[in-house]
Amino acid sequence: MKTFEELGVSPEIRRAIEEMGYACPMPVQEEVIPYLLGENNDVVALAQTGTGKTAAFGLPLIQQINVNNRIPQSLILCPTRELCLQIAGDLNDYSKYIDGLRVLPVYGGSSIESQIRALKRGVHIIVATPGRLLDLMERKTVSLSTIQNVVMDEADEMLNMGFTDSINAILADVPQERNTLLFSATMSPEIARISKKIPAQCKGNHHRTQK
C-alpha cells in the first residue's frame, strides 16, 4: 500500500488530512488520486458512500487549483443539500493550510442572493445541486467557461431524482477540454450510457469499507 506522499499529495494537504486522522490511502484513493494529478484524465468509478471517494477526488482537485486566479476551476455536482454541504466542508478541511482557497456550496432552500454575492467575490471550487446551479446559470450570475474538472458524485441518485436534463444543460456549458469524474453506487443503464461518453483511463469498483 502506498502513502499519500507517494501518491503525489502536497505537504500542505497531507498535513491537514493527517490531523483529520488519515493514516494511509483507501483503495479508491490509491487508484484515483494519481490519475487526477496527471493531465487530461477521466474517471468512472463504482464507489458507495464510505469508500473515501470524497478525498479521492477532493485532494487532487484542491492541489490543482491556482489560488491566485479567483475563478471557478472545478465543479462538483451532487444530488442533495446535505451532501453538498458535507463535500464543501470536507474540501475546506483538506485545504486548511492553503491560503485563499475558496469553496462555495450552491444548493436550493437557501438564499440565492448570498450565493450570487459569493460568486461575485470569486471562488475556486463550486459544489452544487443541479437545480440551483441551473437557476444561477439562467440568471447569468455564474460562468462555467473556466471549469477544468467536473465531478458527478452519486450520479445514480441525481438521475433517479430527475436531474438528467439539468445535468446535460450544465455539461453543455462547461468546456469540452475538461476532466470528467463520475462516481456512482450502481451501474444503471443510464449511468452506463453516460460513462461510455467518458474515455476514462481509470475505472474501478469500490465497495463500502469505512464510514
PLM region spans:
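Conserved pre-motif I regulatory segment
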Residues: 1-46
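Walker A/P-loop NTP-binding motif
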Residues: 33-41, 54-69, 85-95, 134, ...
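The conserved Walker
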Residues: 47-51
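Interdomain coupling/hinge region of P-loop NTPase helicase/AAA+ cores
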Residues: 7, 75, 104-106, 115, ...
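Nucleotide phosphate-binding site architecture
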Residues: 23, 62, 66, 84, ...
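Conserved nucleic-acid-binding Ia/Ib motif block in the N-terminal RecA-like helicase ATPase lobe
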Residues: 11-19, 70-138, 146-149, 192-196, ...
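A general structural signal for well-ordered alpha-helical segments in protein cores
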Residues: 10, 54, 58, 84, ...
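Hydrophobic/aromatic position at a conserved helix-loop-beta junction
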Residues: 37-38, 120, 199
